């Protein structure tokens, strides 16, 4: 589960950068 957290943060970061 802890391995999934950085992936989610990276997705949110990429989404924020896209917008």
Curated annotation (Swiss-Prot):
Where in or outside the cell is it found? Secreted
Please list the GO biological process terms of this entry. Answer: defense response
PTM-bearing positions, type Phenylalanine amide: 19
User: Could you say which tissues express the protein in this record?
Assistant: Expressed by the skin glands.
On the tree of life, the source organism's domain of life is Eukaryota
State if Ribosomal protein is listed as a keyword: no
Keyword set, alphabetical order: Amidation, Amphibian defense peptide, Antimicrobial, Secreted
Q: Which GO terms describe its cellular component?
A: extracellular region
Q: Which family does it belong to?
A: Belongs to the frog skin active peptide (FSAP) family. Phylloseptin subfamily.
Role played: Has antimicrobial activity.
Q: Please give the name of this protein.
A: Phylloseptin-8
The organism is: Phyllomedusa tomopterna
